[in-house]
Every structure is written in structure tokens, then in C-alpha cells.
Amino acid sequence: PLALSVIVLAASEGKRMRSAIPKVLHPVAGKPMLAHVLTAAAALKSAASGLAIDYLDIHIVYGHAGEQVRAAVGGTVGVLDGSWHADWADIPLKWVHQAEQLGTGHAVAQALPGIPDTHTVLILCADVPLITPATLERLINAATPSGALLTVSLENPHGYGRVLREGGQDDIQDDIQDTHSLVTGIVEERDATEAQRRLKEVNSGVMCLPAASLKRWLSGLNTNNVQGEYYLTDCVAMAHQEGQSLSALCVTDPAEVQGVNDRAQLAFVERAYQARQAEGLMREQGLTLADPGRFDLRGSLRVGQDCFVDVDVIIEGDVTLGDGVRIGPFCRIQDTHIESASQVHAHCDIQ
């Protein structure tokens, strides 16, 4: 059985969002980015995950507007509240304050005193909301005794830390289940050579590492880099220097590990999420969507046979459609069950 401690990095101020709302609380499909990540982490404990997890807890490292973040995730206040809190209701949440933002290595180190050496640590980013439980499960299963990291190959890798592998980059495989070549280090963009900057495989920020080793590596970090920060990624090279090898899994869909730093990236993630939801409804439930690109699901939708949804329909909360339901264009439907053979005309607002 696996004892898993998840560390979620949620301390970033997010200045590029130009917002009074903490970055990690900006919504994707009506749900804060942080909540999406917590839902994915909590799902690892379910029977459907395939992981034999004996114990799971989540450590949220917060900094900027910490009380606002805690209140929203705890479900104790206002506009960002929602039924999604039930996703992690039975998982211990532990809040860790990072008073100064001194880098990702420093952020993770704040949480480690509350994690036993025998645990496996899964590190997630609160501004990477599309990560799926299935990918996290594969990452955990593929980890060597020294750990694993999640990577992605990008045509334009500017701004990301480049992954250095044994034997170079010529044998990169894109199939997440088949990538097993070992990693020697990660070099951040600002510290990379010109040759390293040409590499296309980058670090997603998601890692799975043994707690005891992680504590040892973090104690040896320094700030000898352009940013003057403690880089969590330096642990990869430290492991390699000790003769330990980390595996790396390369995801096939870059959107799954897309980070959000500004409103344009938030909009990209929103559309990617909606496309994923629409495809699932069409393939798994047989829903007909007049235009999958003009449909928004901000909650859950269950449909019967032969249902049709026209363009620019917004579904909020928990909605069920009986058999043969037809929804006209420009409708909003919230927390509603619609009986079989019903027809909803254009511009209806149903709550």
C-alpha cells in the first residue's frame, strides 16, 4: 500500500493576471483552478484509480492572499463556493504558509516537516488546472525508487525548464506509457545554454519523489542561478549525481500541463477544458452538440438517449436531461432535471 502526500504549490501572486483575485482562484468552467487540482489529487484515492493507496493527504502551500484562498477552498465564503468541495471532503487538507516566495524548492521545503520519510510525495501546481487523475496515476506507477517527473514536448518551449536526458534528446517518445529514458537534470530557461534552449522537451512542474530523498536533496539546494531562487528542479541533477535515476513521462496533450500566468492562458485553458468535456459527452453519453466549440459546461451534465443541444448553451451546476430532450440556442440551464421529450426554446434561463 502507498502512503501519498500531495503538495500543491499555490503561493504565487500572479501579477500578470492584473487582478485583485488570487491567481489560483480564477475559475475554469466556473471552478477555481486550485479546486480543479485538488479534485484530481483526491481522485487518486478512489477505487477507480487503480492505485493501492493506504493514506492520502494534501498540503497546500499558500502565500499571497492566503486567507482568501483558504476561505474559498474551505467553502466558507461567497462567489467561488460550489458543490466541488465534496470532491475532497474526506481528505485531510493541511495548510502551509510560505511567507517569502524564494522559489519552488523553498515552497516544497515548507511542507516537508509535516510529511513522514516513508511517504511518496506528489508535487502539483495550482495554476495547472487540466491535469488528470489518469496521468497522475501513470506517473506514480512509472516512478523509479528515486521518483519521476512529468514532461511535455513543445514546438515553442520558450520560458520552460529544459529536460536533459541520458544520450541526448534523439529518442524522445511521446507516448506517456512508453517513455522510460532516464533524466540527468533540468535547466531553467534563463540558465540554459543556446544548445540547451533548442531542446523541446520541458518540465511540467509535476513530480513524484520519495519524501526521505526529497528532504535530503532540498537541504543541499542553493541560489546560484540567474533568478537567485531555490529551484526544486535542481533535485533531479542531485539525484543523478548520487547515482540515482528518475524516470520521465512525456504527456501527449500539452494542454494538460499548460500553466496559467495571464488572462490569455486562462482563456486557452478554458477552451481546452470545454473541448474535453464536449468530446466526453458526445462519445460517452451520445449527446448531439450542434457546435462543440460553442458549448459551456460549468458543472455536471447527464443525458438520456437522443438529446440535442444547440449553440451557445451554458450548463451550470447539476443538470440532467431525459430521453429526447432538445435545447434551443442561447439558453442557460442551472441545477435542473428536464423530463424526457421536452423542448426548451431559444433564450431560456432555467434554474
Which residues make up each language-model segment?
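Conserved N-terminal catalytic core of the sugar/cofactor nucleotidyltransferase
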Residues: 1-5, 9, 13, 27, ...
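Short beta-strand segments
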Residues: 9-10, 123-125, 150-153, 187, ...
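Residues that scaffold the ATP/ADP-binding catalytic core of kinase and kinase-like folds
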Residues: 16, 186, 217, 260, ...
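Conserved catalytic-core motifs of eukaryotic protein kinase domains, centered on the activation segment
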Residues: 17-21
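A structural signal for short hydrophobic beta-strand segments in well-ordered beta-sheet cores
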Residues: 25, 163-166, 248
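Short aromatic/basic micro-patch
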Residues: 27, 130, 208, 259-260
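Conserved core of the sugar-phosphate nucleotidyltransferase
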Residues: 67, 131-226, 233
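Left-handed beta-helix
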Residues: 227-351
